[in-house]
């Protein structure tokens, strides 16, 4: 018989991720799994027992290829002819964290549970955040997979790769 976790038994942890040089989609998949609680053995699709995620330096996230200028996000005002489009470049000028928030939001369920889970995502464009009292565990996104960080095209690697001697 399958055992379900009760609300009293749910413990939420806090995680901190530095988004400097991280690829948007790869970062969003890691974050959405943590927010949904898929990293726990007690995962149940209809319950919210995910963890909180604090993302700092979100203004330094990257897209691969030319998606930063060419990708388009669409929305509709509700009026006839009211479809609007915006590129990630223009959206990040107005709201730096909105690009990552949209990517994570689209990976969550679309109902009330997804909205509740999205409130566990805290995005900050600088180095500082007000959640240091929760003692978040640090997740180094570059050490999970070497494709999670954008390298420059001239062969120089970030310090994460030279310390671990990962070859490409």
How should these model regions be labeled?
Residues 108-124:
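C-terminal structural segments of small proteins and small subunits
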Residues 123-131:
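Short, highly charged C-terminal tails/helix-capping segments
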Residues 1-102, 108, 112, 130-168:
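Ribosome large-subunit tunnel/peptidyl-transferase-proximal elements
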